[in-house]
Amino acid sequence: MNVVICGINGAMGRVLHEEIKTYDNINLIGSLSPRSGRFGQDIDGMPDVVIDFSNTANIDFLIEYATKNKCALLICTTGFSDEDKAKIKEAGKAIPVLLSSNTSLGINVFRKILKSISAELSTFDINIVEKH
């Protein structure tokens, strides 16, 4: 499987990059890094999937890139507007698209813990603040 990562310089992008190195059948063929100024110019081959850990500002480019290359798009970014979500849904008619925000291990473990203890804390007023 040929993978392209957008947001490879962020925390999750770096983790995924290191994980990919441990598999013989998954190849990182390039990255899309908006800050580099070379957005998508160094891709070596045809991607099977683009995995996005960047930010909402890149969604138009990512949809265009994935559609043009007829590859799947896994979006792991939060904060999309209703208009962005409509674009993502429309892209799903042409290519496989999965919008799965907060894919980090920590968030998923946290969600599991919250589910298991929420009944015990039903009388508590709890606030959760997300910080990057």
Question: Whereabouts are the PLM-identified features?
Answer:
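Hydrophobic beta-strand scaffold residues
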Residues: L28, L73-L74, V97-L99
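Extreme N-terminal starter segment of soluble prokaryotic enzymes
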Residues: M1-V4
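Conserved anion/nucleotide-ligand pocket segment
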Residues: V109-I113, I117-K131
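Rossmann-fold NAD(P) dinucleotide-binding segment
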Residues: I43, F53-C76, D82-E90
